[in-house]
């Protein structure tokens, strides 16, 4: 049986490896791929979930790293973080522009506890913001589920399609309940069982080496 897998799509952010690490800490296998990876290849991996990372660009500028609308139509839960959140909204018909006030650092954030992402998260929590663009208008079908004093869309969701956008960085420790949020996505929204361990990977690698050796000897 194929093991459950969450794919992290890299848009050039500084925390990409950390995102993958946090997913693995939820006992879910995770791999990182470039945003240039072909959609058919992603689909063939049969991921349980997809996470879009942050990045240094503005998604509305020519030549910025992007993805196709079809990525959000695979029927797989998708979580966009920072740039990934903005890109999701931009591609699906929302609006992203320069923020009147740049947010950087620990920021008090108010969340909608009815959202699956914020289950068992404090209604008022501290998150790590680092953005100069902001989502000024959410895409059709989305609902705002978190905000700050300067950021009207700190998080948004379209539960019908299992699409989630978070403007902040839940993967860093400065976001006090970030691990819980990622756990809610990976184990709750994506439905991963959380049975993966590092030792399982080593066991599989050993098995593959054994099979390769057996084939070589034939």
Predicted segments, located by residue:
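Glycan-recognition surfaces in beta-rich domains, encompassing non-catalytic CBMs
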Residues: 215
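Gly/Ala-rich beta-loop-alpha elbow adjacent to hydrolase catalytic centers
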Residues: 80, 84
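Catalytic-core regions built around general acid/base machinery
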Residues: 67-75
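Structural motif
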Residues: 51-53
